[in-house]
Amino acid sequence: PNPENSGGNIPAIMIARKEERMNEVLRAIRERRSIRVFRPDPIEPEKLEAILEAARWAPSGRNTQPWRFVVVESQEKREELGRVVTQMDMVRTAPVTIAVLRDKDAGYDETKDIQAIGACAQNILLAAHSLGLGACWLGRLRDPQVEKIIGAKENEELMMLIVIGYPRERPAPKERKPLSELVRRI
């Protein structure tokens, strides 16, 4: 057997690099925190594009990709949102807020669409973290006023807002329940 290959046509170095990247993903999952206080620094357009690209690659049932995004960057719109959102300070001070909507016409099953949008949101949070940014997912926002401010279409339903920016500080990790409390094996 060829020493450059590892059981097939995949060079061993590529397998090692893949394992290294996987460790980066696992590290990002463990280190990511919800950031609620931001520095005023703007987000570079290429970083924002990378975050949206990561969101686009989330899994969805039947590949329906039911998510749509409205990127709120203007101070005026952030102030307007801040007047109607409970977490107003985060929305006002984060340089970017991404509204994540469900396109009701694109999906095939509401529950599966919402699950897919959850995966999409996790991609946004992890991508932001990996780029040195912080983010926080704001739920409980099914508010017609918010949908009007962001210009949601008739077939779109607001699922969440995600505020993104450079963290003013990185909070310490919160305790997690042990797997023994969360997992049953049968």
Named regions from a protein language model:
Residues N2-N5, N9-I186:
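Acidic, surface-exposed loops and disordered segments
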